[in-house]
């Protein structure tokens, strides 16, 4: 509608009954969708019914079947920088898979290429370190700098997992990737108000115990994608009785 002017007004919202039609299209296009609902019974009030945001659907945080792919993780990532080292964490909210790592910029970029996160949390303070990379900046969502405080991050990690140390996960307490892991937890609890009880384990991706491949090798071996439908190498472990191999 023109709203009384000679130019069109961009779409800002749509009725709830059209949710199934538009939600997956908007989120797959990289947009963030806030779902607003009535917060009180209209029969019990004579005033305007209160409405509020009850859910926030973003590219990296969704449980909608139309958005998720059954044989592919949907990762939310977070990146932080400290003393020329990069920390990276990845969480699939739908499965609870939670990973962290640390290393050089090239190593982190290699992990990003392999995991293909749909949304990336980063502070504007650290953005300059990624300015010359080929990461799609439209995937970025900026978080506050206070989340980068190491002590704050450690406390958040301890509180979430109800532990007094991360040694049980095989992770050194000085691992800077813990900051990015905490960023994800803060973001989901504050912006999305998600219950994360199913996120009960944190796994470190260690460069010394991993076989790293650059994007050209992965492409040439057709591990994740193939020029022919159904021809990628991961198809070989998808025909199993267990669901785990399809998301390895």
Residue ranges with predicted function:
Residues 243-247:
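A short, hydrophobic C-terminal helix/tail in secreted or cell-surface proteins
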Residues 1-242:
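Charged catalytic and DNA/RNA-contacting regions of genome-maintenance
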